[in-house]
Every structure is written in C-alpha cells, then in structure tokens.
C-alpha cells in the first residue's frame, strides 16, 4: 500500500511540474517576442517605448515624444509662423496642446530630425527612405502595407479606417501635421512619418490615411511638423 501511495505521489508531482512548465511555455509563446518585458527604449525625456520586430527591422511602436536630442540639447518649440526661416529646427504638440502628446507623439521639422545630435535615443535613428521601402516591401507592397501598420478600430482613426488590422503591432496613429504658418490639420485622418532622406527641396516621408490601406511615399515641406518613428541601429 505504501509503495502504491508513493507511486501516486510521484505521479502528481511530475504531472504538476509538467502543467507548470506547459503553462509557462504557453504564456511566453502567446506573447509576441517583440512585446516581452525588457524590449523597451527610453528617450532623453524619460518616455518609454515598447518595440516591435517586423522582418529584420526593429521599430518603436509609438510616435516619438521627446523634446531633446540624444545629447540632451533641447529641440525648441514656437507658436510663430516659421515660413521665413531657412532651416528651422522645432518640435510641437498637435494644436499646441500637450495632452495630445501621450497618444500621438510630437511633430518635428525635417531639419530637426536630420540634425546630427539625433532626436532618437542612442542606438536608434530616424529611418531612411530606403528603410521605409524595405518595410513596405516586406509587408506586401504599397497597396496593403498601411492596413498592417495602422491601429485597428476607430478610437483614434476616423471611420472607416479602411483595412486596418495592425497585424504587425506597429500601431500607426493619425497624428496630423503642422504647416509653416502654424496651422494644424488632419489629426484622426492621416498619419505622416518623416524619413531622413532628402528629396530637395522636400524631404521624403510616408503617409497612411483613414480611408484606404496604402502606405504612400511622398515629399513634404521640410519646415512642416510631421511625426517620427525611430528604428534601431543594426
């Protein structure tokens, strides 16, 4: 009888350990690798961003929010018309309302995002046009890439937010833009993203919209305020 009890006791111990091991593995497997604790990066203002791996690239899963370059220097802001400035380096909260920053990040001029002091955290950078095109190609091309990058639903995007699945975890948001004369437009409608590449007299960028599934390459006025997603150095 004692021998039989020992056998059952061993059975329950082994079974319990197997269940614990199985559940632990399941939790790790069910959590995307790019979202596991520790895969985060912090900017000079102390903002913490989770990261997402798409193909061979590692991206932040939020728009940049910092007011400082990676060396600690301030990226200034202004409420003025900057159309008369030759190479303005500024950042803004959409509508000059800082409550928008937590969700949509800040808007930066192309001159600020290409400054050698680097608006992205150390070890990260503003993606080049080629890096954006690599992302687009990996996701199946211009016609479908936007849908896989946009946050799903209509909490932040205006309906219908066509095709949006956020299959990548990139969670693109419609942060709008700032014009040279200080007007703001397109929040909830469009998500613009700078690249670091020049298309003189414009800067290359990418656009996603609420009413299609596209990721569209375009040239934007360099003094305009546009969102930024940082990509990890490899």
What are these language model-derived features?
Residues 21-24:
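C-terminal motif of bacterial Sec signal peptides marking the signal peptidase cleavage site
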Residues 2, 26-27:
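Beta-rich interaction/scaffold domains
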Residues 2-12:
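Bacterial N-terminal signal peptides that target proteins for export
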Residues 27-234:
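Conserved positions within compact, well-structured domain cores
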């Amino acid at each position: 009888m004692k021998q039989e009890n020992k056998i059952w006791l061993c059975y329950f111990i082994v079974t319990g350990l197997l269940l614990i091991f199985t559940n632990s593995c399941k939790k790790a497997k069910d959590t995307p690798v790019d979202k596991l604790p520790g895969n985060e990066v912090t900017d000079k203002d102390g903002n913490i961003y989770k990261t997402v791996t798409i193909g061979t690239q590692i991206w932040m899963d939020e728009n940049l929010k910092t007011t400082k370059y990676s060396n600690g220097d301030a990226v200034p802001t202004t409420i003025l018309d900057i159309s008369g400035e030759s190479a303005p380096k500024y950042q803004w909260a959409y509508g000059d309302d800082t409550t928008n920053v937590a969700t949509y990040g800040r808007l930066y001029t192309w001159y600020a995002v290409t400054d050698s002091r680097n608006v992205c955290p150390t070890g990260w950078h503003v993606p080049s046009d080629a890096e954006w095109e690599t992302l687009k190609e990996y996701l199946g091309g211009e016609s479908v890439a936007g849908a896989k990058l946009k946050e799903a639903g209509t909490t932040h995007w205006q309906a219908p937010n066509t095709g949006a699945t956020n299959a990548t975890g990139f969670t693109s948001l419609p942060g709008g833009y700032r014009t040279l004369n200080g007007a703001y437009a397109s929040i909830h409608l469009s998500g613009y993203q700078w690249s670091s590449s020049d298309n003189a007299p414009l800067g290359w960028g990418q656009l996603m919209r609420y009413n299609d599934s596209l990721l569209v390459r375009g040239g934007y006025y360099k003094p305009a305020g546009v969102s930024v997603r940082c990509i990890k150095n490899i």
